[in-house]
Each structure stands twice: as structure tokens, then as C-alpha cells.
From Swiss-Prot:
PANTHER family: TRAFFICKING PROTEIN PARTICLE COMPLEX SUBUNIT 2. It comes from the Eukaryota. It comes from Schizosaccharomyces pombe (strain 972 / ATCC 24843) (Fission yeast). This is Uncharacterized protein C15A10.12c. InterPro entries: Longin-like_dom_sf, Sedlin. Pfam families: Sedlin_N. GO terms for cellular component: cytoplasm; cytosol; nucleus; TRAPP complex; TRAPPI protein complex; TRAPPII protein complex.
Length: 148
């Protein structure tokens, strides 16, 4: 049985602008267009979920958005309307949503610390790409999760 592994992380701003996209496995960089497409599809699902008038839950974790072949996408929607999309490849393994929920909350915390840095005056989409704290913390979190 092949254990699950993270495929990509996408972070989108309040207006669905892409703030960050990280393809976890460097060998899959050639699949950038596919992962961008999955991220865009996920944004449509997120917007449908959060704009649903019947939605009663205030939980930021939106859960499983969809499955494309062997890649499952999950989402977290912050109170500032920042969207976190995480894709997991799990061909023969059931991924526990509680694990994904915890992982997305930790990513959200890392993101918050990076963009709320009082010493950084530059809060643009480049903030995450240039933040050493964000990159190192995220890479450590991802490597820990992939080997658990």
C-alpha cells in the first residue's frame, strides 16, 4: 500500500488571485499547468460552498473538495477570505480528514506569522515567495507530514 503524500499547496487571496503555489515534488514541476487547473477548479468549489446561503457551519476547514484521478483536494477558508488548497495523492490509502484539518491549520498559522510580520512593510503576493520564515517552516511541516 502506497502511503499518501502531498502534491501541491495553493494559496489564493480574497479576489481569488494566486498568492502562492508550491509543487511539493520537484520531479512533478512539469505538471504545473495541471495543478494550476486543479487549483482553479477548487476555487470555484470553495466559492460555491462559502456563498451557499444554507451553510450553517463557521468552520474554516471546508473538507474534501473533489477527487481528480488519484489526487484529492482539500480546502481551508480563513476569516480574511484567504483560501488554502492542499492536494494529496493517495491511490490506495484513505486519508483521515482530521490529519488534513490539522495540517491546513498549521499552514494557516505559518501564513499568518509570515504576513503579519511587523518588520515587513511589503505585503504583496511576493511576500510569501520571499519570506524565509514561510518557506522554511512550510518545507519542514511538509517533510514531517510526508514521512509520518
Amino acid at each position: 500500500m502506497v502511503k499518501p503524500r502531498l502534491v501541491f499547496l495553493s494559496i489564493a487571496g480574497p479576489k481569488d488571485e494566486q498568492l502562492y503555489l508550491e509543487i511539493i515534488d520537484p520531479k512533478e514541476k512539469h505538471l504545473l499547468a495541471r495543478y494550476q487547473y486543479l487549483g482553479e477548479l477548487s476555487l470555484d468549489v470553495i466559492n460555491d460552498l462559502v456563498n451557499d446561503g444554507e451553510r450553517t457551519s463557521n468552520d474554516c476547514f471546508l473538507g474534501l473538495l473533489g477527487v481528480e484521478e488519484d489526487i484529492s483536494t482539500y480546502a481551508f477558508y480563513s476569516n480574511t477570505k484567504v483560501k488554502f488548497i492542499l492536494a494529496v495523492k493517495a491511490p490506495d490509502y484513505v486519508v483521515k480528514e482530521t490529519e488534513i484539518r490539522q495540517l491546513l491549520r498549521r499552514i494557516y498559522t505559518i501564513h499568518t506569522h509570515a504576513v503579519c510580520n511587523p518588520f515587513s512593510m511589503d505585503l504583496t503576493p511576493e511576500t510569501l515567495k520571499t519570506s524565509i520564515y514561510f518557506k522554511e517552516s512550510l518545507h519542514q511541516l511538509i517533510s514531517d507530514w510526508n514521512i509520518h
